[in-house]
Swiss-Prot record:
It comes from the Bacteria. The keyword Ribonucleoprotein applies. This is Large ribosomal subunit protein bL32. GO terms for biological process: translation. The gene is rpmF. It comes from Brevibacillus brevis (strain 47 / JCM 6285 / NBRC 100599). GO terms for cellular component: large ribosomal subunit. It holds the Pfam family Ribosomal_L32p.
Length: 56
C-alpha cells in the first residue's frame, strides 16, 4: 500500500490550498436604478438589461 515517505509541511500544505479559495462575484451598479447586480445579467430589482426593459 502506498504511504507518504515524508510528512507534508505546513508551507507545502498551505501553498497547495491557495487555489481552494472562494471568489467574490463581479457586482456592478445598474445603470437604471443604481442597485448592485451581477455583471451581464438582468437587474433583479428593475428588470433592465443594457438600458432596455426585458423583464416585468
Amino acid at each position: 500500500m502506498a504511504v507518504p515517505q515524508r510528512r507534508t509541511s505546513k508551507t507545502r500544505k498551505r501553498m497547495r490550498r491557495t487555489h481552494f479559495k472562494l471568489e467574490i462575484p463581479g457586482m456592478i451598479k445598474c445603470d437604471n436604478c443604481s442597485e448592485y447586480k451581477l455583471a451581464h445579467r438582468v437587474c433583479p430589482s428593475c428588470g433592465h438589461y443594457k438600458g432596455v426593459k426585458v423583464a416585468k
